[in-house]
Regions:
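Transmembrane-helix motifs of polytopic, lipid-linked glycan transferases
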Residues: 31-37, 139, 150-173, 375-379
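Membrane-interface alpha helices of multi-pass inner-membrane proteins
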Residues: 192-193, 214, 219, 227-249
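Hydrophobic, aromatic-rich transmembrane alpha-helices
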Residues: 28-33, 345, 349-355, 366-394
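Short acidic/glycine- and proline-prone juxtamembrane loop motifs at membrane-interface regions
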Residues: 197-200
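Extracytoplasmic catalytic/substrate-binding loops of multi-pass membrane glycan-assembly enzymes
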Residues: 67-82, 91-114, 124-136, 342, ...
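Alpha-helical transmembrane segments and terminal signal-anchor/GPI-anchor hydrophobic tails
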Residues: 236-369
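Membrane-interface helix-loop-helix junctions at transmembrane boundaries of multi-pass membrane enzymes
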Residues: 37-39, 172, 222-226, 379-406
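Juxtamembrane segments of multi-pass membrane glycosylation machinery
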Residues: 7-9, 111-154, 353-358
Length: 461
């Protein structure tokens, strides 16, 4: 198998990897084409399937090439090298491998590795969240012949299934705009790039997609045991890698749950009168569950989250981030301190870096995307200002959009409050960016169709 000594960054992609990659890509695309052929007879939405898989795989290859030849390594390579040491340990001594992946990281367990297996990077080994990524990658490396390129592509392919499930779910609710929704969920350039490598973000975005899909299936009453299982696994991945994502998801989930029940009530007085009750119950249950998960959430627990955000924000704007820092101002880790910075943080999370803040090609691409999102949001904002009632009616009559909107707002504030570095920001936005763009598209289409109907009615008069 292809071997590289640990603690030496990969300088190039070996020809062996390209040969194995060709085989895997042909195999994956062959299976995708066969699956699309079977499914498209039942549902025309599968016309996007092969194209989505191909673009996802191509994005992974581009990610690897850019990180090896442009960035000369990075966290993605460190994840790979740490996972490779686990894979070697799995092959050499499966008992010690089970010990390492099931027990806490200790110095004693660290020395279960040796020169024949290579050693995991210490800063990843002793961080449970980063080491979890390496644990997930170890079996993938085994079937990828321990190739960085091939294992990245396989992970990217696996993550695509969650994106596809969410795409089909949203299209089922909002038919007729599948092409536009495919741009948001399957073909958004920054989401494809940052969600196609060996990074936390690839796994967490896929977990978010599976979470929303399973929650919707649970509410719809379709195979609830399977939905609960998927929901549990997705939540476990989020808690294990980035717990604050679950914190952003949970309040909207509770609102969606209660709102879906109330929306079935036919009497408008009862239905709209219950709205304050919905939000109160969502807050109480959400706060209670997140508090109960305190130990699992660690530094992102309810009582420590604000302090964590403040400390992280101050760190990410230090000089050693080489000029890519920005500053929304320091804030106290209190409710009042967060409330004062929430609007600025939300703008950061949703729309920055602005195009004039780009310092390299990758940042420029993100800036161009953000400019489009900003213009779309401004067009929608104008409609909201001139008729706020219609906007809130749209949200309350569409629990899925209400959920995605609340998740986008909460997550953008969390990211904006805890990030002061554009390099980190473009990656941290991934778990909510595509969902936020979906919200913009659905709301924009709602107003566009409303205007078209109004013009048609005026013409008929």
């Amino acid at each position: 198998m292809f071997e590289i000594t640990n603690y030496s960054y990969i300088r190039y992609i070996h020809s062996f990897e390209w040969a194995i990659l060709t085989f895997y890509i042909l195999l994956i695309l062959g299976m995708a084409f066969f699956y699309q052929t079977l499914q498209i007879r039942k549902d025309p939405i599968y016309r996007f399937y092969v194209k989505g898989v191909f673009i996802k795989l191509a994005s992974s290859v581009a990610f690897c090439v850019i990180y090896i030849y442009y960035y000369n390594g990075g966290d993605t390579v460190s994840y790979y090298e740490t996972a490779r040491s686990l894979t070697n340990l799995m092959v050499h001594d499966f008992g010690n491998y089970l010990t390492v992946i099931t027990q806490k990281a200790t110095l004693e367990n660290y020395f279960l590795f040796d020169q024949s297996t290579g050693y995991p990077w210490p800063y990843m080994y002793y961080d449970s969240q980063t080491f979890f990524v390496a644990k997930v990658m170890a079996p993938i490396l085994l079937i990828a012949f321990k190739s960085y390129l091939v294992s990245s592509v396989i992970l990217s392919w696996i993550s695509f299934f969650g994106m596809w499930k969410l795409f089909t779910t949203i299209c089922r609710y909002y038919p007729g705009i599948e092409t536009k929704l495919s741009f948001a969920l399957l073909f958004l350039p920054s989401a494809l790039f940052w969600g196609s490598g060996i990074l936390k973000d690839t796994m967490t975005f896929s977990a978010v997609c599976w979470y929303i899909y399973a929650f919707e299936r649970l509410l719809a009453g379709n195979n609830r045991i399977r939905a609960l299982l998927i929901l549990a696994v997705a939540s476990y991945f989020l808690i294990s890698i980035k717990p604050y994502i679950l914190i952003a998801l949970f309040p909207g989930s509770m609102i969606w749950f209660f709102h879906a029940r109330i929306s079935r009530v036919q009497v408008k007085l009862i239905k709209y009168g219950a709205i304050p009750f919905i939000y109160a119950m969502a807050f109480v249950i959400g706060f209670g569950v997140l508090s109960a998960l305190g130990n699992s959430l660690g530094k992102f627990s309810v009582d420590r989250m604000l302090e964590t955000a403040s400390v992280t924000q101050k760190d990410l704007k230090q000089d050693y981030y080489q000029g890519s820092s920005f500053d929304i101002g320091d804030f106290e880790p209190t409710i009042a301190g967060v409330a004062g910075k929430a609007p600025a943080a939300m703008v950061v999370g949703m729309f920055r870096p602005f195009i004039w803040e780009a310092r390299n090609v990758v940042m420029l691409a993100s800036g161009l995307e953000n400019l489009i999102f900003l213009l779309l949001a401004l067009a929608i904002s104008y409609r909201i200002i001139t008729g706020p009632g219609r906007f809130f009616k749209l949200l309350f009559e569409n629990p899925l959009i209400l959920f995605m909107f609340s998740y986008s707002v909460i997550f953008s504030i969390l990211v904006g409050m805890s990030t002061s570095n554009f390099g980190a920001l473009v990656r941290f936005k991934l778990p909510f960016l595509s969902i936020f763009v979906c919200v913009l598209i659905v709301i924009y289409e709602f107003y566009r169709k409303e205007s078209a109907l109004a013009k048609m009615a005026q013409t008929l008069r």
